[in-house]
Amino acid sequence: MIQVPSRSELNAWILAVAAMTALSAFSVFAAGADLFGVDIARSFGWWSFAVSAAVLVTVLGLVAIFNPRWPIDHQATALVAAALSWPVFWVLRTNWLNADGNMLTPKLEADVPRVGAHLTHDELLELFFHSRLWYYTHQWWGWSVVHAYQVASCTAGAVFIYVLIRLTRRVAQPAPWLFVAGVLAGGYMQLFFGDVENYTITAAIVAFYVLAACRFLEGEVALWVPATALAIAAGFHLEAAWLWPSALYLAFISHRRRGDRSEAIAAAGAACTILAATFLYFQFHGLPLMRFFSSHAGHALRMNGVFAIGMPLRYYLDQLDLFLLLSPAVLMAIPLSIWRRYGRDEITVFLGVSAASMLLLQVIWRSQIGVLDDWNLYSLGGLLTSLFLWRAIAGAVRTRGFQLTAAACAAVAWLHSYSWIVMNHLHGR
């Protein structure tokens, strides 16, 4: 039974958005860039920020008022949106590299001519793809390592936009435009603005995994489709293996529907074959399996130095600050939980398990270069949390007041996240 929206629930939404605004303002005005927030004066200038804020609030307000529900997930719409997004990602690409990003140029320049690619088991296919991309583009057009990474990042962003729009009918039919606006408002979008690291392609593949899983839950594809998508993602970066609990949930649904484990066993076999074939190929092409034990994943198996146990308080405060940047709408989880707006359908449970799995990574996996420098390591958790939250928000906006409040939430998130993205773009200028 759907609970009727009440005035007290609306007030709770307004309070959550107000708290979100206050936290953003504290990061901006009280601490500036020192708190990994944004410095509006350096990023935009006050007048530019004010104009941007006014335009954003007006556009999202009109979307909230009219709440257009015509379908936007058509193939043509998704392809056009993806194509139009690429130049936006490129024009605003980052000029800030973290410690790992700065190390990629000497590593690839040393290893690619020698063995064909710079490789580790942690991010195997990401590094292989970027190594070969740089090798060919450097030969043909003289591209640098950074330039090749940034082209791949923006292309992954266009792919993500395509998948996001294709998701809307399945995930947020009551308010598709609000869902898209909300998901695009997270700090994890920096991944697709030319980020020079090994998470961008993985993020796009994980988005495909979510789409494939939703299609499986709606009976459109077999279980092997999302299973192989997740296996490919894990081959690109082992971080994606933290999503196996969500794959187990899909296997449970398959067993409940069919009454046997045959489909789940076949899907698991396909996924394991992909991963085994990947590792076996590189055993004979530059990355022996024995080196797995010196990787971060290998250290994790030995419980050696990768878990955030007994860290100083500042570490956990940085994690909280980062999480609020990656998923600004997280405070909306409070009223959504109190009024039970998440639902118990299979897609909601799947998204919840996926988000929880990646948030567990953020809680227990220790950053090796500092939390704020390692923001992209934890970005998938913010992305999946936003998909989960904005699905619930889109399903709960049943009156004009809720629509406007949700639009305000998206506007605050956009201003904070994209001020940071612009600040990174202007870095060094």
Whereabouts are the PLM-identified features?
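Hydrophobic, aromatic-rich transmembrane alpha-helices
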Residues: 58-67, 162-165, 318-345
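Extracytoplasmic catalytic/substrate-binding loops of multi-pass membrane glycan-assembly enzymes
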Residues: 90-108, 116-133, 143-147
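Membrane-interface transmembrane helices that cradle and orient dolichyl/undecaprenyl
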Residues: 170, 209-224
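Perimembrane helix-loop-helix junctions
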Residues: 212-218, 243-273, 337-344
